[in-house]
Amino acid sequence: MWLFVLFDLPVGTKSERRDATRFRNFLKDDGYLMLQFSVYARICRAEEAVDKHLTRVIKSLPSKGSVRALQVTDKQYARMKLLVGDSSKNEKAAAQQLVLL
């Protein structure tokens, strides 16, 4: 099971940039992999883990912007296609995590 967090945060002022950076750092510290600059994904073992991490995200939300969460099964994640560019180190590590679970 995967939990995706997708966001679009304002960065027009210094405080907005600081809030956006704090949110991205929170996601990285909580084990999310950056797939794109504002798209992060985390592997979760069960529905309870998804709920736990979603609660953490909600507690860390910045005051402005748009943040969305999407829950995806391992099978759906494996069917994701990279259309342009190369897989990042994070994505390769995520594929290895799938094998371990």
Predicted regions mapped to residue ranges:
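Basic nucleic-acid-binding interfaces
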Residues: M1-F4, L9-L101
